[in-house]
């Protein structure tokens, strides 16, 4: 069995879909389907079993058997960078991860979990070293806290453990995320509604729409996860991005080009985001490459085209 926590979410459901495509249906999904629309992400997938996230953690803490488990992909978390309830965030993102990590170590089960580029905050250097880690929000801190906790164990592991620091991920099956969905999702909706894409005016010394992020295709994130599963000798914390920052203007033009029409409107930079916004991110892939991973990552032109082609063919994952 392969366990995927957050398996009905954005990256998790794409992982389940790819596992199915590779012939794996022995997948246990763990999630919280209070928001039932997430279930649509799994409508075209086959799974072996499902557990609510609270029931699952109770199950493993009680040391009840789940049968042979090949690997745990831990993607379940509160990923809202605008959430400031620290107690809620730490319970969901830190304490849950800690319990699952020890459960896997006790059973020698590979544990591949989701960290985040939010740990870097406003830094201009994005290498996996403590001196560059200064999160700007409690979400980023909750991810950093677990990375710090894990580092204490890296020299004495019983099985593979990998944390992937995701940069700005986009792709199908993110429609349930609302305001936290990628800019591709929002640009697509805006174009359909008004014929315009809205971008922030300049900030932090960047011109209008020239803020830069490392936008990474969800399919590449999934391929990297499965590469890691095939390389159990690799453990550690690694960036997951393309290694190339691109402007929001460039991303907007990639979406406009797919639709064949549209204009850009620049709107004032929100007051509540000042001092809490990453105007520049770019994954340093040196450590990932040194670990032997030679996977190529899609540029935004390819990734956006693949994304919008996919959702055009599958209304259930269409931006709305």
UniProtKB/Swiss-Prot annotation:
NADP(+) binds at residues 10-11, 31-32, 38, 53, 75-79, 92, 143, 169, 177. Pathway: Nucleotide-sugar biosynthesis; ADP-L-glycero-beta-D-manno-heptose biosynthesis; ADP-L-glycero-beta-D-manno-heptose from D-glycero-beta-D-manno-heptose 7-phosphate: step 4/4. It catalyses: ADP-D-glycero-beta-D-manno-heptose = ADP-L-glycero-beta-D-manno-heptose. Substrate binds at residues 168, 179, 186, 200-203, 213, 277. The active site is at residues 139, 177. One of its GO terms (molecular function) is ADP-glyceromanno-heptose 6-epimerase activity. GO terms for biological process: ADP-L-glycero-beta-D-manno-heptose biosynthetic process; carbohydrate metabolic process. Contains a large N-terminal NADP-binding domain, and a smaller C-terminal substrate-binding domain. Belongs to the NAD(P)-dependent epimerase/dehydratase family. HldD subfamily. This is ADP-L-glycero-D-manno-heptose-6-epimerase.
